[in-house]
Amino acid sequence: MANVDVLDLGGKKVGSLELADELFAPSEVNEALLWEAVKHYRASLRQGTHATKNKKLVSGSGKKLWKQKGTGRARVGSVRSPLWRHGGTVHGPQPRSYDYAFPKKKLMGALRSALAAKLADGKLIVVESFEVSEPKTKLYRTALDKLEANRSTLLVESSQSLTENLYLGARNLANVELVLNNEVHPYDLLRYERAIFSRAAIEKLQESLQKTVSRRRKAEVA
């Protein structure tokens, strides 16, 4: 079991937390799986509203310009022909969804890899609680500075512990995103430089991820 320090919002150690080796060991990092998860996530974000005008949609008359035979010229149907300038586009992009099915086991494996990578890089921080006295952005900005999270930061709180003070105080922080423990995605962990979990959030996330690890893998790590 790996131990991680639990801090308060002032940056002082107030305890420690044991993390499961089958989730947070450096050997659990699978870069290929992380790439697949990020590719799927970014594909699902695409609007897919691109469209080109084909022969049916482009403006222009559909009348045949000249008779089929006898003129010596090449046969032609209308000015909307794809062969002509300002004609329709052939096989151009049309509106579609770029989303595709991604196995849940792969997603959970990628999440374990992202967490292990963050811990190995020393960029994963656990705090006892995000609670402050009032919903002030300044209070959270000061807390992040003391936690040495001056750049982009991902805040992860459990759904049961989310408070109005945290929601209102963190929403106006630049380069900071707040998510719940059941919403965190590998892409979020890779996108932000530091990830700060509350104790409740990391415990619940660890509990749910342990259910996705095979017994064989648990035995190998043990």
UniProtKB/Swiss-Prot annotation:
Organism lineage: Bacteria, Pseudomonadati, Acidobacteriota, Terriglobia, Terriglobales
SUBUNIT field: Part of the 50S ribosomal subunit.
GO BP: translation
Transcription keyword on record: no
Family that this chain belongs to: Belongs to the universal ribosomal protein uL4 family.
HAMAP family, alphabetized: Ribosomal_uL4_B
Matching SUPFAM superfamilies: Ribosomal protein L4
GO molecular function, one term: structural constituent of ribosome
The protein's role, per its UniProt record: One of the primary rRNA binding proteins, this protein initially binds near the 5'-end of the 23S rRNA. It is important during the early stages of 50S assembly. It makes multiple contacts with different domains of the 23S rRNA in the assembled 50S subunit and ribosome.
GO cellular component term of the entry, any: ribonucleoprotein complex
Protein name in the entry: Large ribosomal subunit protein uL4
The entry's keywords: Ribonucleoprotein, Ribosomal protein, RNA-binding, rRNA-binding
Signal peptide range in chain numbering: none
